[in-house]
UniProtKB/Swiss-Prot annotation:
Entry function: Cell division inhibitor that blocks the formation of polar Z ring septums. Rapidly oscillates between the poles of the cell to destabilize FtsZ filaments that have formed before they mature into polar Z rings. Prevents FtsZ polymerization.
Subunit description: Interacts with MinD and FtsZ.
GO biological process, one term: regulation of cell septum assembly
Name this protein carries in UniProt: Probable septum site-determining protein MinC
Classification via PANTHER family: SEPTUM SITE-DETERMINING PROTEIN MINC
Taxonomic superkingdom: Bacteria
Pfam families xrefs: MinC_C, MinC_N
Positions with biased composition (Pro residues): 145-164
Keywords, in A-Z order: Cell cycle, Cell division, Septation
Chain segments carrying region Disordered: 137-164
Claim: Cell cycle is one of the keywords in the record: yes
Length: 277
């Protein structure tokens, strides 16, 4: 190995990116929709890499102008999903063709089951020496009678692979004021107190707010579709799970407004349900 080869190395990596799905090729409508979405979402998506999905658009797209609009909102475009002339034009503008995959849901925790009654007493493991075959023992010059064969001791049951403990939840024990933003990377977020209007709570896992949720909440920030939002008092500006979000422009139904609630993703639809007290 030469000295030069030590200057870099290749490693596999998984990159999370926002998927921006185009339904129109008209630049004015696209930029207006982008401005509105980013105004609604605040800083949720800022500095997140973007893959532009133009697979549903046949008309030609002004790629340089669209990419400039995305960068203007601190959304760096890195890839494209498209076909034909739009794919070629996007690649000419500097995007790489990518294939999209659905992010896996968080694996369910392992559940231990009690062994049956007749197997409650564990069988001790047999030492390795007891399984070896050796020459028979002798007394004097007379050959010894072969010892009666003993039944082989049962082997110890294979142990299940160790499951790493999940990261501890990030717990915030004070109210969050307008303009404050908290992000729990690779874990759940628990806020004990109020999330004020203009504040943002984000987690790769679940979001729990034990108090009024009046700001913006996003669970499953890295694409976990099984993540959920829980709050004891729902009055949010924006709710999002795995990138699917809902801006709360009008007051929620009386069965949900200022009530304990659960927010989760059902396919591509964001569901908001009241929690029974």
């Amino acid at each position: 190995m030469t000295t030069d080869s030590l200057a870099l190395d290749f490693k596999s990596a998984t990159l999370y990116a926002i998927r921006v799905v185009l339904h129109d090729a008209d630049l004015d409508r696209l930029t207006a929709a982008l401005d509105q979405r980013m105004a609604d979402a605040g800083s949720f998506f800022e500095n997140e890499p973007v893959v532009v999905d133009a697979s549903r658009v046949d008309d030609p797209i002004d790629w340089p102008a669209l990419l400039a609009a995305l960068r203007g909102h601190n959304l760096p475009p890195i890839g494209v999903v498209a076909e034909g002339a739009n794919l070629a034009a996007a690649q000419a503008a500097g995007l790489a063709a990518v294939e999209l995959s659905t992010p896996p849901a968080r694996p369910a925790p392992a559940v231990e089951t009690a062994p049956p009654n007749d197997a409650a007493t564990p069988v001790p493991a047999v030492p390795a020496a007891a399984l070896e075959t050796g020459a028979s023992a002798t007394t004097g010059n007379a050959p010894a009678e072969p010892a009666p064969a003993e039944p082989a001791a049962p082997a110890a049951a294979p142990q299940p692979p160790a499951v790493p403990a999940p990261a501890s939840a990030l717990v915030i024990t004070k109210p969050l004021r307008s303009g404050q933003r908290v992000y729990a990377r690779h874990t759940d977020l628990v806020v004990i107190g109020m999330v004020s209007q203009g504040a943002e709570v984000i987690a790769d896992g679940n979001v729990h707010v034990y108090g009024p949720l009046r700001g913006k909440a996003m669970a499953g920030a890295r694409g976990d579709t099984s993540a959920r939002i829980f709050t004891t008092q729902l009055d949010a500006e924006l709710l999002a799970v795995a990138g699917v979000y809902r801006v709360v422009e009008d007051k929620l139904d009386s069965t949900l407004h200022n009530q304990p609630a659960l927010v989760y993703l059902d396919g591509e639809t964001l569901r908001v349900e009241a929690l029974k007290r």
